[in-house]
UniProtKB/Swiss-Prot annotation:
Ca(2+) 1 binds at D245, N247, D285, D340. The lineage of its organism: Bacteria, Bacillati, Bacillota, Clostridia, Thermoanaerobacterales. Pfam families: Alpha-amylase, Alpha-amylase_N, X25_BaPul_like. This is Amylopullulanase. Changing D734 to Q/E: Loss of function. Gene3D superfamilies: Glycosidases, Golgi alpha-mannosidase II, Immunoglobulins. Substrate binds at H524, R626, H733, D734, D793, R797. Its cofactor is Ca(2+). Residues 1441-1451 have a biased composition (Basic and acidic residues). Keywords: Calcium, Carbohydrate metabolism, Glycosidase, Hydrolase, Metal-binding, Repeat, Signal. The record marks D734 as: Transition state stabilizer.
């Protein structure tokens, strides 16, 4: 224990300190590199009291001062008047994220006028003020002092004046903390306040108390805490576990599909290959681990146990492993089931199911995906890394004006619209009500004259551009310009040419080394086709199906069975379009429509084969197919399609049009490529860097790490030949032009500025750099390279702007395409992520040791591709495991040169630009061959390694781990001998070694074969095992066995010998004359094998260590037991010896019955229902004269046994779910009641056959409280209503809740969203942002049901909602103000009558507005605080009428009552005559 220095010493020190340093204050200034992470200012209704305006986020008067370490302060310049206030902190003068705190405002109460200091910490988002919190002064901040200081680099041990382990209160809760990386070891420490011992606290928070011990078992990060109120001191260090604790540490669980240590090999695997899956847990945390996987092909779920394979080198983690292999192609979905005592955890994929690091949950959540593909799957070598060019034929080039106007009609008898001006915009009937519209209002009937001859004329242009594959949109006869509505599959459309033109184009392309892919549309035809003939235009040919139906007999048409026409003449049209009648399915497949299958697939000249080999001339045929709406045609059809084209051109491309994960269609029996829209969307999300709806998908900004995760997700799911042949597009005929996505549209006055174009072009160039450097087949949509712009269909199909091209952009594309073509490494080199942080993404490609990723021979080459979407910066890229030091690179774009030094390469990247670094030719990048005969010999305190010399090796590197397959650490380098002795080992631990060979240039070979070693003390003897006496059976009466072990140098020290393993073995010998029938179960074979349990150290016995273990015998009769010990992880065992000290000795004892010999009463086991992937058992309770101990569950594959015990449950449990079953397999079960004396009574036997049963999936959703009464729907990839927002209407179950039950097959990978009947009313995120599709895997959670509980945050059509008052509300004259109450999205800028304020965390806001008499108009405006988004910007006007006050009439005064006077009599006058008059009243 540390002893305090004497007072005299301290006084002497202080005198010297004062004399030397005098008046120098002790300062704890922030580091120079600690710059403010943001501008923070306090805003609230106090601002007007200091000469500002309330809630002014743009104020420069309340900007907080940055103090370092994330801390900010602001003190009011004057005293605030007494009263109540509200405030919060705004960042960067914006309400983005809703301010800090995000939930509501903070209150401030002042009893008297006061100056107030506000405190904020950026790192913890904590806010407070001086009325609630008083910090410890800087000079008195607590600090850690002790033997730990030097270990963590915090000054000299036990010297507070040198301690840099300063603790800070990051959350303003009077708890100060400090975090450090602490090496393994034993330490003692205390906490002092300030740089002296004047005030210090030790164990239990006692002032001047004892030192605090800290025993750290492995290198780890530890946070130290000090409570300034209680003075308690603690850490967050969790010492290693020693056994089950009914708890699983979720934060320590890990499975990373992108890390070969956790999943090897990476990515999709071939049939017959073995994949190794591993999961990490806190050491000693798990009692068992299993993997549960669903097989998409067999439709079964299987559980396989995992085995513990070792621990991490620092002892912090343990690892469990399972190996799987499949001899058939399939797609596997897996998760882990982890148990520790009574606790069960599940570990599956992350919420987005992108692979990589997963997530632990209490219930089954998301599955990881594993693709198993046919080992024979391949693509043509010319396809891997080729550059594709997609052409929409009518819009590319007019090479033959004579065929421009050969059509009289388009669809039916609609007219054809021919353009005279090549540079016209396509007719867009959406614009028919706009001024200047000149079209005819008919969709897809306008033509420009582009044709096959035009493509032929431009082949040299394409060759010069670097194109090696052309993909043609449909060219067969059709009434429309897009030609996805085929009229005749056997003919080239007359506006495009004829068969001879086609053959010439194919031959000319092939002569230039260019392959051609055709577009096949086999889900539907045109209603105006020779096959359907809705309009009766082809009556001179064979009768069309529709005309035959009209004649009352559809079978009269040779095409009659292709379509299903209902009695009323209706039929299924693709996505509801009656112009596109769908080919029907029989028994789930179009292939079962024989005449259709023969026409497309089976006949010698079937369409699938003919156009690859027209008239027997392969050179005059195309080279493969792109296949439209591939997922809307039965897979069986495509399997036969593949077999057919393989007879003409083996492995010819079959490119599927699929917009999501296509892995299930890429297993090897059909498609071998896909239109990679996943790639497109990820690249756009990264580069565009803002939310944008392109008509197909809403893009949301992501950083480089998320980009890498999404790209790696594709890489790991697709078979390797497919991944290197995917059609990596940025745009197509179905998407908005990429230049317009990036912000430029020449025909839109809001997007056609030079500034917009410059920015869009920079973004496009950046995307092209990524596209041309990445594995796959990059695809250019015609004209993109020339600056073509255009919005949604049909605007994305403008004519190629010949003569008006963007020459600079064309030259750039030519350059970047040819960089790819000239460097094989960019085509078939391997792929490794090198840097993914913020705005910068970098990946590497390699051909080393003379082999590419497919094992083909090519010269060595290395490439590094870097893209930067942000500001200019210097990027340090770690190349330690990628390429050796000294390799020189040249940027093929800029010409700059770079060299790898000290394991990194530093690349300067300008804003919105990139680099393609190619290693200079002539450098030696071929490493020596790997060592194959490494050997290890274990000794006491050392491991001896040896191997044979390798050609060209000048030295060797030694690597060490504790588990096979990874976690290697280099422990020695530049070893020049072919032997090595490792003495830095701990006896009793397992080590794994591998060695690499290094040549004179520094090229390092692959790892050698792995060898295990177990250095250990030698065990000399084990014995002194006690004799167990006759034992009475009982659940609470265990047998205790003791034994001793001696190992020189290990057990002769005080305490337990390190890493010694001790185990007790026991087994049942026989009844020994006892009546054991009460303990037995009929049909269960008595286990007479040894059972081994761990023993624990209980103390020293001289030079020996003493161990003890317990077990509970459950049968009367004779039992045998023995103890064994191992000092080398169980590689060798020493058993307890007899009296001679040499012979292994097992001892026996007798177990006799207790006084309770009465078995439990019988129990009834119910017949289980049929469930998928599980059997649920239920039984009646059993009783006993003493007590029931529990129930044992037994299982067999035969009714007569043998039965095997699979579980034991407590006496209060009357059910059990067995998930270790296979659908379709028969199982038998019995349940046995066991009492406290192990008397047993068995139930009846039941038979169960789990099988695939549709699962009732119950979707419950909670919607915002302002949701209108128009209902809620669930839309997704349901087969019966594919992404239909008005289908699947839910039932209202509460004020804000809806529910629906759908029947789905187990294993279904469902994606869905909630809407209110329309995509205009789809759900949104809490910030109003677009959210990703929700995803679930359908599983049986019990009783063939699954419950999904979701919450909708917001709706697209309601960015703001006003609860009250309603528009045109009338209030009485006495109401002089009214409260506006509403709800809006987080981070919104809300103003009411141009006055801004902040909404609460849940989006609710209230604002009181004054009312004048009469009509009051309140203007409410909301908009996002970041980029403008029209969808999130809305204005609402609320009219409130305040009644005028009622004007009361003045009352008529009442005279006082007086007696009326009596008039004197008067004579009656005689009036003079008067004219008539109207008396005015």
């Amino acid at each position: 224990m540390f002893k305090r220095r004497t007072l005299g010493f301290l006084l002497s020190f202080l005198l010297i300190y004062t004399a030397v340093f005098g008046s120098m204050p002790v300062q704890f200034a922030k580091a120079e590199t600690d710059t403010a992470p943001a501008i923070a200012n306090v805003v609230g209704d106090f601002q007007s009291k200091i000469g500002d305006s309330d809630w002014n986020i743009n104020s420069d008067k309340t900007v907080m001062t940055y103090k370092g370490n994330g801390f900010y302060e602001f003190t009011t310049p004057v005293a605030l008047p007494a009263g109540d206030y509200e405030y919060k902190v705004a960042l960067n003068h914006s309400w983005e994220g809703g301010g800090v705190p995000s939930q509501g405002n903070l209150s401030l109460h002042l009893d008297s006028d006061s100056v107030v200091t506000f405190y904020y910490n950026y790192n913890t988002s904590s806010v407070t003020d001086s009325t609630k919190y008083t910090p410890i002064p800087e000079e008195k901040l607590p600090r850690i002092v002790g033997t730990i200081q030097s270990a963590i680099g915090a000054g000299d041990d036990w010297k507070p004046e040198t301690s840099t382990a300063i603790m800070r209160d990051y959350k303003f809760n009077n708890v100060y903390e400090y975090t450090a990386n602490v090496p393994k070891g034993y330490y003692e420490f205390k906490v002092t306040l300030g740089p002296s011992w004047d005030i210090n606290y030790g164990l239990n928070g006692e002032q001047n108390g004892p030192n605090i011990p800290l025993n750290v078992a492995y290198d780890t990060k530890i946070t130290f805490y000090y409570d300034s109120v209680s003075h308690n001191i603690w850490t967050d260090y969790n010492p290693p576990l020693t056994g089950p604790d009914n708890n699983i540490y979720y934060d320590d669980l890990k499975h990373d599909t992108h890390d070969p240590f956790f999943r090897s090999p990476f990515g999709a695997i071939k049939t017959g290959d073995t994949v190794t899956l591993r999961i990490q847990a806190k050491n000693h945390d798990l009692e068992s681990a299993k993997i549960s996987y669903w097989d998409d092909i067999k439709k079964t779920r299987t559980e396989v146990p995992m085995y513990k394979i070792g621990q991490s080198p620092d002892g912090q983690y343990e690892y469990w492993e399972v190996k799987l292999s499949f001899d058939y192609p399939t797609r596997i979905w897996y998760y882990f089931i982890l148990k520790d005592g009574t606790k069960t955890a599940y570990y599956g994929d992350n919420d987005e199911q992108l692979g990589g690091v997963g997530k632990a949950t209490d219930t089954v959540n998301k599955d990881f995906e594993l693709t198993v593909y046919d080992k024979n799957l391949d693509t043509p070598d010319w396809m891997k890394g080729a550059v594709m060019y997609q052409i929409f034929p009518d819009r590319f080039y007019n090479g033959d004006p004579l065929n421009d106007r050969l059509k009289e009609y388009s669809r039916g008898f609609d007219p054809v619209e021919y353009h005279d001006d090549w540079y016209d915009l396509p007719d867009n009937p959406n614009d028919k009500d706009k001024p200047g519209y000149t079209g005819d209002g008919i969709w897809n009937n306008d033509f420009f004259g582009g044709d096959l001859q035009g493509i032929n004329d431009k082949l040299d242009y394409l060759k010069n551009l670097g194109i090696s594959v052309i993909y043609l949109n449909p060219i067969f006869q059709s009434p429309s310009n897009h030609r996805y509505d085929t009229t005749d599959y056997t003919k080239i459309d007359e506006l495009l040419g004829d068969l001879d033109t086609f053959k010439t184009l194919m031959k000319e392309a092939h002569a230039r080394g260019i392959k051609v892919i055709l577009d096949g549309v086999f889900n539907h035809t045109s209603d105006d086709s020779i096959y359907f003939d809705r309009y009766g235009k082809y009556l001179d040919n064979e009768l069309g199906a529709y005309q035959a139906w009209k004649q009352g007999d559809q079978s009269k048409s040779p095409y009659g069975d292709w379509y299903e026409i209902k009695p009323d003449g209706t039929y299924e049209g693709w996505w509801g379009f009656d112009s596109l009648p769908v080919i029907r399915q029989i028994n789930g497949s179009e292939y079962n429509v024989k005449s259709w299958a023969d026409f497309i697939i089976n006949n010698p000249n079937a369409i699938s084969k003919y156009w690859l080999n027209p008239d027997g001339d392969k050179d005059a045929g195309a080279d493969g197919w792109r296949l439209d709406v591939a997922n809307e045609i039965a897979h069986d059809f495509w399997v036969h399609f593949r077999a057919a084209i393989n007879t003409v051109k083996p492995n010819a491309p079959m490119i599927a049009e699929l917009w999501g994960d296509a892995s299930l269609d890429l297993l090897g029996d059909s498609f071998n490529s896909v239109m990679n829209y996943l790639f497109r969307n990820a690249v756009i999300d990264f580069i565009l860097d803002k939310q944008f709806d392109d008509g197909n998908v809403v893009h949301n900004p992501i950083d480089a790490a998320k980009l890498d995760q999404r790209l790696m997700s594709i890489y790991e799911r697709y078979p390797l030949p497919v991944f290197y042949s995917t059609m990596n597009l940025l745009g197509s005929h179905d998407t908005m032009r990429i230049l317009t996505v990036f912000g430029y549209n020449s025909a839109n006055e809001n997007q056609n500025s030079q500034e917009a174009k410059d920015l869009a072009v920079k973004r496009l160039k950046l995307a092209a750099i990524l596209q041309m450097g990445y594995p796959g087949m990059p695809s250019i949509y015609y004209g993109d390279e020339a600056g073509q712009s255009g919005g949604k269909d049909p605007d994305n199909r403008r004519t190629f702007s010949w003569g008006r091209e963007d020459k600079d952009l064309q030259d750039f594309f030519k350059k970047v395409v040819n960089i790819r073509n000239e460097n094989q490494v960019l085509k078939t080199g391997d792929l490794e992520t090198l840097y993914a942080n913020g705005d910068v993404y970098a990946f590497g490609r390699r051909i080393i040791n003379g082999k590419d990723v497919f094992g083909n021979s090519y010269p060595d080459s290395v490439a590094i591709v870097v893209i930067n979407k942000g500001e200019a910066k210097s990027v340090q890229i770690d190349t330690t495991k990628f390429v050796r030091d000294g390799v020189a690179f040249t940027d093929a774009l800029s010409g700059k040169t770079y060299t790898v030094r000290d394991g990194q390469i530093v690349v300067e990247v300008v804003a919105l630009d990139g680099a393609i670094l190619i290693s200079d030719p002539g450098q030696n990048l071929t490493a020596p061959q790997p060592i194959t005969d490494l050997k290890a010999v274990s000794g006491n305190g050392q491991v001896d390694l040896s191997w044979s010399a390798v050609d060209r090796a000048v030295s060797y590197n030694i690597y060490r781990s504790t588990v096979k397959g990874g976690l290697y650490e280099k422990i020695a380098s530049n070893v020049t001998q072919i032997t090595y002795i490792d003495t830095d080992v701990t006896n009793g631990l397992k080590y794994v070694y591998s060695v690499t060979a290094v040549d004179s240039d520094g090229n390092e070979s692959a790892l050698s074969n792995e060898v295990e070693a177990y250095p250990a003390f030698s065990i000399g003897w084990a014995g002194n095992m006690n004799q167990v006496d006759t034992h009475v059976i009982g659940v609470n009466n265990p047998v205790e066995v003791y034994a001793e072990i001696w190992a020189e140098g290990l057990t002769d020290k005080p305490g337990q010998g390190e890493n010694m393993i001790a185990q007790l073995g026991y087994r049942y010998i026989g009844d020994g004359g006892q009546d054991a029938t009460r303990n037995k179960v009929e049909g269960v074979e008595i286990n007479k094998d040894w059972t081994w349990v761990d023993a624990r150290y209980v103390g020293d016995s001289g030079n020996n260590d003493k161990y003890m273990a317990k077990f509970v015998p459950d049968m009367v009769g004779t039992w045998e037991y023995i103890m064994r010990f191992s000092s080398n992880q169980g590689q060798d065992w020493t058993y307890t010896k007899g009296p001679d000290g040499k012979t292994d000795e097992a001892k026996q004892f007798i177990v006799v019955p207790s006084n309770d010999v009465e078995p439990p009463t019988a129990l009834g086991l119910q017949q289980p229902g049929i469930e998928s992937s599980r059997v649920t058992l239920n039984w009646s309770l059993s009783t006993d004269n003493v007590a029931i101990y529990g129930y044992e569950i037994y299982k067999s594959l035969s009714e007569t046994g043998p039965f095997v015990k699979i579980a034991t449950v407590a006496d209060t449990v009357y059910n059990y779910v067995d998930t270790d079953v296979v659908n379709g397999k028969v199982y038998y079960y019995k349940v046995v009641a066991v009492d406290t004396s192990f008397n047993r009574t068995a139930s009846n036997i039941v038979k169960a056959t789990p099988d695939i049963i549709p699962i009732k999936v119950i979707f419950n959703v909670t919607v915002p409280d302002y949701t209108p009464d128009d209902g809620a729907n669930i839309a997704g990839n349901f087969h019966d209503a594919f992404w239909n927002p008005s289908a699947h209407q839910m039932t209202k179950t509460g004020p804000n809740t809806y529910s629906i039950t759908l029947t789905l097959n187990e294993g279904t990978q469902l994606e869905y969203k909630y809407a209110r009947g329309s995509w205009d009313k789809v759900e949104k995120g809490e910030y109003g942002e677009e959210i990703a599709n929700r995803k679930i895997t359908v599983v049986n959670q019990g009783s063939n049901t699954m419950v999904v509980n979701d919450t909708v945050q917001r709706w697209r059509d309601l960015p703001i909602y006003i609860y009250s008052p309603k528009d045109n509300t009338t209030v009485d004259a006495n109401t002089n103000e009214i409260e506006i109450k509403g709800n809006t999205y987080k981070g919104a800028k809300v103003t009411i009558n141009d006055e801004s304020f902040v909404q609460q965390e849940n989006g609710v806001f209230t604002k009181v507005v004054p009312l004048e008499y009469g009509v009051n108009t309140t203007k409410i405006h909301v908009e996002p605080s970041g980029d403008k988004n029209n969808e999130l910007t809305k204005d609402i006007t609320i009219t409130v009428i305040r009644e005028e006050p009622v004007q009361e009439k003045e009352p008529t005064p009442t005279p006082e009552s007086e007696p009326a006077p009596m008039p004197e009599p008067q004579p009656t006058p005689t009036p003079e005559p008067q004219p008539s008059a109207i008396m005015a009243l």
